[in-house]
């Protein structure tokens, strides 16, 4: 069926060309978006025509209803949909006959005309000129919204965006969030910088890296798992407020909140500590939410998330003790293992840091409203400064919302001797088989030896933030072109032919 449709369309395009019409023109002068037109003419009365108005817009035809020598159709552009009305007595017989014979749902067209409000109160373009801008070779997926196999949507996100306004809007919001983050930080005097994606030594997080090969030097390199260590080199060099927003790569599994290629932002401020980063985090999130929604309250999965300041603060030690009855600072590793066993948690690496992280995993989903989780033990915070009052823990926080880590921040460790010793401990974990332990980065230690001022650092997961603010249940819904298990193009085509859109 798809093959026959394509052949029919190819023949139709030849017919259109034979009539002297270019089915793929080079340009169209679009002066108004659908949103512009509706906003400008919303105050018209039903039935009122604004003859002296002149608009020019373009988009994809999403619906089409013929009525003899006239037709109504809806055009969809990036900002929404708008109705258009075409009549033979206005555009002329030849133009209307061409429209009737060759223009169909899915075609991209440009229209020019005046504006009126229909009797039902819908702002409508009265078409005076129309131009075919593209005739697709594939049919529009009328039942695309009913697909049960979401991997089809992920593989062909472009069609998902065409068919589902909510998908297009979700990504519009995503990039609006990114724009707002930059606007906020730039207004605070932060400078956006760039750091390497290919690294000789990777670090800044506990994760398994991707390995690639650089032919010119004939060496293996790593794709970055975080931007932290190079951003702190900027601070050493004399920058005082920096950030980088970009992709990181971790060779790990897929889940509703994990994706091997993901977007994050890291922010560093000299002469600041983690208290300053908490204030900055609250201020940034409230700025974004209020700009997007005009309120500090957001609905996520039927739960109202309230971003009103100040946010709750709780120590990791206290929270785990409250819910599991184990003290991560005082109790033995045997006691921690016993508690984990009671909850059917298998532990491959019995290092104390891993045990603490496994314990936290058991209780993380109990945090719903924005909460700063404070004072992580030194064992799981190799880049954070020891707490000024209790050296067993660090000046670190994670922002937890709806049971998910949204941000991670420290008073940054700037003692090169302490940093070297912590890298040594991480190196021993790697030797013991922990592929996520951090690598020894001697150049970073050397940078610290030149002196880094007291610094506060903050990292925010952009994808999880977008999930929260678009009410999306899984991370792949907010990544435009996420990873899916590869199948052949032919198999994909067979799936479409077989009615996977039903």
Curated annotation (Swiss-Prot):
It catalyses: tRNA(Lys) + L-lysine + ATP = L-lysyl-tRNA(Lys) + AMP + diphosphate. GO terms for cellular component: cytosol. Its cofactor is Mg(2+). Mg(2+) 2 binds at residue 405. It is found in: Cytoplasm. CDD domains: LysRS_core, LysRS_N. InterPro entries: Aa-tRNA-synt_II, aa-tRNA-synth_II, aa-tRNA-synth_II/BPL/LPL, Lys-tRNA-ligase_II, Lys-tRNA-ligase_II_bac/euk, Lys-tRNA-ligase_II_N, Lys-tRNA-synth_II_C, NA-bd_OB-fold. Mg(2+) 1 binds at residues 398, 405. It is an enzyme of class 6 (ligase). Its EC number is 6.1.1.6. It comes from the Bacteria. SUPFAM superfamilies: Class II aaRS and biotin synthetases, Nucleic acid-binding proteins. PANTHER family: LYSINE--TRNA LIGASE, CHLOROPLASTIC_MITOCHONDRIAL, LYSYL-TRNA SYNTHETASE. This is Lysine--tRNA ligase. It comes from Thermosipho africanus (strain TCF52B).
